[in-house]
Amino acid sequence: MAALIAENFRFLSLFFKSKDVMIFNGLVALGTVGSQELFSVVAFHCPCSPARNYLYGLTAIGVPALALFLIGVILNNHTWNLVAECQYRRAKNCSAAPNFLLLSSILGRAAVAPVTWSVISLLRGEAYVCALSEFVDPSSLTAGDKGFPPAHATEVLARFPCGEGPANLSSFREEVSRRLKYESQLFGWLLIGVVAILVFLTKCLKHYCSPLSYRQEAYWAQYRTNEDQLFQRTAEVHSRVLAANNVRRFFGFVALNKDDEELVAKFPVEGTQPRPQWNAITGVYLYRENQGLPLYSRLHKWAQGLTGNGTAPDNVEMALLTA
């Protein structure tokens, strides 16, 4: 029984590691949904005033989406790889296809949160109703045999999102709210459909155009994940041991806890890596092969003692990025 449970946990661990991007996007979407719900309850208050409603409603949908998009761009490692590529190599080693591929990857991942925010805002309908209530055509509103009074129609319609207005026009208020929520939710579902189709077509096109097999692409993604994790962990230990050595040289001793003492004793650090080495392993990386053997990262390429762009006649460069 214990062996079966352990095997199931191992399977789940491998599954989640292989789907880390999908899971991360899902967590981002869930976090955005929670933030949107909290915003609607706590911070959203329609001004119910002509001209102000429109600006407030659009701002409530657009500004948070823009902020989430910029945060997504900032938190994407590919963004800073592209910046480093432009800084150190002026992007001269990348053709238009890889640059377009990299930008698409950055923008696609950054769009998860803002699209989720926009969809939830439209499905709830509050911001849309607030923004467009004053623009409803009064002549199109009827309640039984009565029509909407044209006098001060804009001012009255602008107050409907707050549940205000003359008591004898309450039936019109419900009609306006129902009509605008219908439009808002329709746009929300259409946006979901368009995004789903685009994601599906992008995934199909990516795998169709890739010269690598599905298994090799999965291996490449696993390699990059493991390399990043090991590099970060090793860099943390290296910097800690180096800092301990420098503090000891300055004071003549260093106050270490038991774990730090074990690190210093187990991993002696004599020096640091020169800047050219850091530059060599930093930047945009495409899939490359050297004499038929794959090079899965800039660090892998550097470890093989290869320099330059790796596009000699016996080498192959492909416009591919890891997932």
Curated annotation (Swiss-Prot):
Record topology, Cytoplasmic segments: 1-21, 77-101, 207-323
Tissue specificity comment: Neuron, astrocyte, and microglia.
Reported effect, residue 103 to A: Does not affect ATP release
Cellular compartments annotated: Cell membrane
Superkingdom of the source species: Eukaryota
Biological process terms in GO annotation: ATP export; calcium ion import; monoatomic ion transmembrane transport; positive regulation of apoptotic process; regulation of microglial cell activation; regulation of synaptic plasticity
Site-annotated residues for Not N-glycosylated: 168
Activity regulation comment: Inhibited by divalent cations such as Co(2+) and Ni(2+).
Region (Intersubunit interaction): 214-251
Consequence of changing residue 132 to A: Decreases ATP release
Keywords: Cell membrane, Disulfide bond, Ion channel, Ion transport, Membrane, Transmembrane, Transmembrane helix, Transport
Central pore: annotated span: 14-39
Region (Hemichannel docking): 145-152
Subunit structure: Homo-undecamer. Two undecameric hemichannels can assemble in a head-to-head manner to form a gap junction.
PANTHER family linked to this entry: CALCIUM HOMEOSTASIS MODULATOR PROTEIN, CALCIUM HOMEOSTASIS MODULATOR PROTEIN 2
Stated family: Belongs to the CALHM family.
Function, as annotated: Pore-forming subunit of Ca(2+) homeostasis modulator channels. Mediates ATP release from astrocytes and ATP-induced Ca(2+) influx in microglia thus regulating neuronal ATP and Ca(2+) homeostasis, synaptic transmission and neuroinflammatory response. May form intercellular gap junctions. The gating mechanism remains unknown.
Annotated protein name in UniProt: Calcium homeostasis modulator protein 2
Name of the encoding gene: Calhm2
